[in-house]
Amino acid sequence: VIFHVGGHDDGALTAFDADTGSVVWSWEGDGPGYASPMVAVIDGVRQIVTVTQEHIVGVAADDGALLWERPFVSRSTNNSITPIIDGEDVIVTGHDLGVARFRPTRLGGRWTTETVWETDEVSMFMSTPVLADGTLCGMSHLRAGQFFALDAGSGETLWRTEGREATNSAVVRAGDLLFLLNNDGD
């Protein structure tokens, strides 16, 4: 079980033994970002990818050692949108940061991140998007809330609604269906 404990400016990404509750490892970088940590295998290394207060990080799943980090400072203090893992790439978004896809890579013994694409046509605040068959679907906070779809491979905007749809949305995939529930329950 892995999650970020603590609060603003003070926290640690922490792994706990599921049977005993004892701490297995703890990475003390900057404070938590309130997004759910994701497990990814990148370049053969099992790692935990998460958003912190000021970065997106990849730490080794077995011991919590920092592998890579990428600056990620949004207008809001709660980076709460869970990163999307697509193969060995990471797709991220934050309040007024647009959306970016990047690729962590290991060159020799050193990790780095390379931007694949970025767009500022949509951006998210509290609503995590969903990846469905190569399409990223979600709720942008721009234009007072608009649903959108992006080509996850290129970052091209496929469509956007007019706006004024909702403040936030829960986007859920169930088989071939997407459910987009707004904050009014519609």
Residues covered by each model-derived region:
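Noncatalytic, solvent-exposed loop/strand surfaces
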Residues: V1-D186
